[in-house]
């Protein structure tokens, strides 16, 4: 495993000069799309290549600056396999002819742990709101905060993040317009929060094994969010039971060790189309 800085990601052919690529049976890249999207000519020279993609929801998110960019990029890479973290996103890529496979986002079970402390924050959200991609998230959360005691927070260390999740009773997830569930949903569930999440639809919940009223609560808009919140307050015992089942579910479905097996299964399938052009052709 190798970790690449931004400059190395921006010029992969230079980075790979000293790597005996023929000694590897598989190549898996988990890099920033904005750094690799102009390097399709070089990427086509890497044999048995799999790209791990977490941001392809931006390809069809309303108002996204990257609209259509992911499909255009992957169409330039015939024979390349893509692991996508969204079920609907994976179907979107497949419809465009991309060899895409669904493996959801997850969390480190050794870090995201249940702590024995009081949950003194009734409603909480931890995360960014400044990006244009999160404008709908910001609108929903700020609107909710005007009528409910929602705490919108940022944390600065990994330990602080876990400790704060363990203080939240109900985690308000607002993945509005993203078409998939971000990792923070599963991290919150792993830390014992009751997850109140925006329904993504298009088979996303079924693919993840998420069941409304069983291991999380789902809402469709602000009105239904407020209704589900009121239900949770009126039925604290049932709400706690859902939180417990949610934690059990993500530990079995979204922990890194479980996802590693899924990724291994995807990349172990033989590649039928491998590069036949040497890297030096593209200098």
Pin down the residues of each PLM region:
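Small beta-barrel nucleic-acid-binding modules, principally OB-folds
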Residues: 162-163, 228, 232
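Acidic, glycine-centered active-site loop in nucleotide-sugar glycosyltransferases
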Residues: 205-216, 228
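Conserved acidic donor-binding segment of nucleotide-sugar-dependent glycosyltransferases
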Residues: 214-223, 231-236
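A charged, aromatic-enriched C-terminal amphipathic alpha-helix characteristic of glycosyltransferases
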Residues: 233-267
């Amino acid at each position: 495993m190798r970790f690449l800085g931004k400059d190395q990601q921006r010029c992969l052919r230079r980075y790979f000069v000293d790597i005996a690529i023929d000694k590897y049976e598989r190549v898996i890249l988990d890099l920033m799309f904005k750094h690799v999207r102009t390097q399709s000519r070089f990427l086509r020279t890497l044999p048995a290549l799999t790209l791990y993609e977490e941001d392809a929801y931006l390809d069809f998110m309303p108002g996204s600056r990257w609209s259509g960019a992911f499909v255009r990029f992957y169409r330039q890479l015939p024979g390349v396999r893509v692991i996508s973290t969204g079920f609907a996103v994976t179907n979107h890529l497949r419809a465009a002819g991309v060899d895409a496979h669904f493996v959801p986002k997850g969390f480190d079970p050794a870090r995201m742990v249940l702590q024995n402390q009081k949950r003194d924050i009734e409603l909480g959200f931890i995360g960014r709101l400044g990006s244009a991609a999160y404008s709908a998230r910001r609108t929903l959360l700020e609107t909710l905060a005007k009528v409910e005691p929602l705490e919108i927070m940022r944390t600065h260390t990994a330990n602080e993040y876990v400790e704060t999740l363990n203080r939240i009773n109900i985690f308000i997830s607002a993945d509005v317009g993203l078409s998939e569930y971000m990792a923070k949903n599963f991290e919150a569930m792993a830390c014992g929060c009751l997850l109140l999440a925006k329904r993504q639809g298009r088979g996303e919940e079924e693919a993840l094994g998420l069941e409304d009223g069983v291991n999380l609560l789902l809402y469709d808009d602000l009105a239904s969010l407020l209704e589900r919140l009121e239900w949770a307050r009126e039925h604290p015992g049932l709400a706690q039971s859902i939180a417990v089942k949610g934690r059990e579910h993500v530990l079995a479905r979204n922990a890194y060790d479980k996802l590693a097996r899924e990724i291994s299964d995807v990349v172990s399938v033989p590649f039928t189309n491998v590069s036949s052009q040497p890297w030096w052709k593209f200098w």
